[in-house]
UniProtKB/Swiss-Prot annotation:
Protein name: NAD(P)H-quinone oxidoreductase subunit 2 A, chloroplastic
InterPro entries: NADH-Q_OxRdtase_suN/2, ND/Mrp_TM, Ndh2_N
Taxonomy of the source species: Eukaryota, Viridiplantae, Streptophyta, Embryophyta, Tracheophyta
UniProt keyword Cell cycle present: no
Subunit annotation: NDH is composed of at least 16 different subunits, 5 of which are encoded in the nucleus.
Catalytic activity: a plastoquinone + NADH + (n+1) H(+)(in) = a plastoquinol + NAD(+) + n H(+)(out); a plastoquinone + NADPH + (n+1) H(+)(in) = a plastoquinol + NADP(+) + n H(+)(out)
């Protein structure tokens, strides 16, 4: 009898929760239409996987890519609409949030073609892989529009959990298992530190969770200059540091890059940076409005350490993926300059512009690494020697992406860094910009070292891997080369036509 009553209560409670969720979606669903498209794509993937056999694999890629493209289209149609706060203040829609959502969707759209051949060669489970990618994308999109502390905590956890599962997707690879364990432990620690900082912010503001209400609460309680806010700032900055992976919070990055499947690394290397940057701009700029000098100082220290340590350690690496891991640490130092400058002097516009170029440069580089790794089975930098003699297209594509990452003119990376450093200089960050310029020159050295290996034609320097190099007979080879070509073009052409990109980026204000 007791069990029967408890069962009825459980059914009633579940029904109430379902009806409340349905009511919220009915009246607020139009505000998250791009996210709803991804949810529909996830459900469709599951249904097809349950009702079909493995011969329908092309449908999985088609549904995933189509849902991402339609979601991007929905975002573009919503561009320049008035800012809207929905879901009882938990979610905000404006141009600034939408540009980050667009970048995350763009990353995922380009990463899926990179994974096709790798998944077929390694015989990984395709459905679960795509589900994790789409769910991580969904978490990143909700993070970009999050307007309260609870959503800001839950959304990145959704992204992080999928990232842990993706990094350990090749279960029989010991390096992948080690990378996943380190990633999981560091991610769990960072989340606990972040939520502890949120608790200080919550208490100091008088129990407010919405970002703007926290500011009002701090004014009402006269706590905006209290030690509690300083403690909250330190904990939140440390928690954000593990998400952004600047030095000295970069310990997990090289191991995860080296041990995870290469398409997963390509996905995480860009989407995690975009999502974490969106989180940093909102959580630091709004609740810590009265502590701007303090968090500027903290971020300046992180930027300097990242630019110096990241580029110095990248020189000594022998693995291509570890080199790109340390390179990404240096790159995030440049992005932090834009976060520090903020709305003044087009800081956010320069950060968004550089991040757009970084996506194309980084994904183009990883596309080349995926192709080379599948055809040779090696990741060592020295094994790339003489690649130009066997595959000129792949060698030239990799060289262009590396040169753009280094910031050589007239490629997109040069103009992105130029605009970013110029905005930093106008804001008075002379020392920070000087460090950025010096470390950019330093990064060109190790990029050119790889390009020299690619272009060498002497037989004694060509490794057996390149000497026995063979193109893959798989049809899916076309998709990864198409994605690589798009990224290479995007790393080159935007340098010539910067004005439209800058105009769009300058429209993205709170």
């Amino acid at each position: 009898m007791i069990w029967h009553v408890q069962n009825e209560n459980f059914i009633l409670d579940s029904t109430r929760i379902f009806m409340k969720a349905f009511h919220l979606l009915l009246f607020n669903g139009s505000f998250i239409f791009p996210e709803c498209i991804l949810i529909f794509g996830l459900i469709l993937l599951l249904m097809i996987d349950l009702t079909s056999d493995q011969k329908d694999r092309p449908w999985f890629y088609f549904i995933s890519s189509t849902s991402l493209v339609i979601s991007i289209t929905a975002l573009l149609f919503r561009w320049r609409e008035e800012p809207i706060i929905s879901f009882s203040g938990n979610f905000q829609t404006n141009n600034f949030n939408e540009i980050f959502q667009f970048l995350i969707l763009l990353c995922s759209t380009l990463c899926i073609p990179l994974s096709v051949e790798y998944i077929e060669c390694t015989e990984m489970a395709i459905t679960e892989f795509l589900l994790f990618v789409l769910t991580a994308t969904l978490g990143g999109m909700f993070l970009c529009g999050a307007n309260d502390l609870i959503t800001i905590f839950v959304a990145p956890e959704c992204f992080s959990l999928c990232s842990y599962l993706l990094s350990g997707y090749t279960k029989r690879d010991l390096r992948s298992n080690e990378a996943t364990m380190k990633y999981l432990l560091m991610g769990g620690a960072s989340s606990s530190i972040l939520v502890h900082g949120f608790s200080w912010l919550y208490g100091s503001s008088g129990g407010e969770i919405e970002l703007q209400e926290i500011v009002n609460g701090l004014i009402n309680t006269q706590m905006y200059n209290s030690p509690g806010i300083s403690i909250a700032l330190i904990f939140i900055t440390v928690g954000l540091g593990f998400k952004l992976s600047p030095a000295p919070f970069h310990q997990w990055t090289p191991d995860v890059y080296e041990g995870s499947p290469t398409p997963v690394v390509a996905f995480l290397s860009v989407t995690s940076k975009v999502a974490a940057s969106a989180l940093a701009t909102r959580i630091l700029d709004i609740p810590f409005y009265f502590s701007s000098n303090e968090w500027h100082l903290l971020l300046e220290i992180l930027a300097i350490l990242s630019m110096i340590l990241g580029n110095l350690l990248a020189i000594t690496q022998t693995s291509m993926k570890r080199m790109l891991a340390y390179s990404s640490i240096g790159q995030i130092g440049y992005v932090i300059i834009g976060i520090i400058v903020g709305d003044s002097n087009d800081g956010y516009a320069s950060m968004i512009t550089y991040m757009l170029f970084y996506i194309s440069m980084n994904l183009g580089t990883f596309a080349c690494i995926v192709l080379f790794g599948l055809r040779t089975g090696t990741d060592n930098i020295r094994d790339y020697a003489g690649l130009y003699t066997k595959d000129p297209f792949l060698a030239l594509s990799l060289a262009l992406c590396l040169l753009s990452l280094g910031g050589l003119p007239p490629l997109a990376g040069f103009f992105g860094k130029l605009y970013l450093f110029w905005c930093g200089w106008q804001a008075g960050l002379y020392f920070l910009v000087s460090i950025g310029l010096l470390t950019s020159v330093l990064s060109i050295y190790y990029y050119l070292k790889i390009i020299k290996l690619l272009m060498t034609g002497r037989n004694q320097e060509i490794t057996p891997y390149v000497r026995n190099y063979r193109r893959s007979p798989l049809r899916s080879n076309n998709s990864i080369e198409l994605s690589m070509t798009v990224c290479v073009i995007a790393s080159t052409i935007p340098g010539i036509s910067m004005n439209p990109i800058l105009a769009i980026a300058q429209d993205t204000l709170f």
